[in-house]
Amino acid sequence: MKTRKKTCLCLCLALLLCLVSCGKPASPGEESGSSVTTQGVSSDAQGLTLADGLSITEVFSYAGPYVEDGSGDPCENICAVRLRNDTAEHYQYLEFEIETENGVYAFSASTLFAGAQMTVLSKNKDAYTGAGVRSAKLVTLAPFTKTPTVHTDTLEITYTDGFINVKNLTNGMLMNVYVYFKEMDDFGYLGGITYRTGFGDILAGDTVQSGAANIHKDTSRVVFADYSE
């Protein structure tokens, strides 16, 4: 088994995800490619509608690890939302805002699959004290341009706390292999951030291990992988 380490971290928009130290926040546009649209939004008594089938079901004050920058630092009273995707579309990246009696809160989220739910924290760590929500606005929406997959026919991906192993199941070399993962909680995905870990080129039949500081055996989930041939 070969062992490689990679380090990095970010969650922004050149359009998409996030990566962190050998499990770095994936940068927008670094995944499978996407097209970006900008839209407005409406609100109703049932919640906040960002787009058809895309809604905020709850706004609340969050306490726990701050996941959006990959640090996991303790935080409390941070503005957070429950985001729900009831469409048939997989979204690679989105940015949105909510306006409350106390001001505007900004959010970024990535890898929101069809039918999925996600808890997203204010990207500026803004505090929330229960102020009434007036409206919401969708700033950026970018669907995946190809269906995300973990490639179970060509890759065998396993992980433990802090490490990911990838085996090439094919008869040829796979180049620029990346694995993307997210944290989970009882609601669904925890954090808009998506982590990315690179493995370089993997020869036929070989297994490569890479450190991924933010992956946890019991609370993380690999959401997709990517490579070139």
Protein language model features and the residues they cover:
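Intrinsically disordered, low-complexity Pro/Gly/Ser/Thr-rich segments with frequent PxxP/GP/PP motifs
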Residues: G103-T129, Y189-K217
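Terminal connector regions
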Residues: D44, N124-F163, N214-E229
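Bacterial lipoprotein signal-peptidase II cleavage site
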Residues: C22-E30
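C-terminal motif of bacterial Sec signal peptides marking the signal peptidase cleavage site
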Residues: L17-S21
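Asparagine-centered strand-capping/turn motif at beta-strand->loop junctions
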Residues: R82-A88, N165-N171
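Bacterial N-terminal signal peptides that target proteins for export
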Residues: M1-C10
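Short acidic, flexible loop segments centered on an aromatic residue
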Residues: A88-G103, G172-Y189
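Short, solvent-exposed loop/turn segments enriched in Ser/Thr/Gly
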Residues: D73-A80, T158-F163
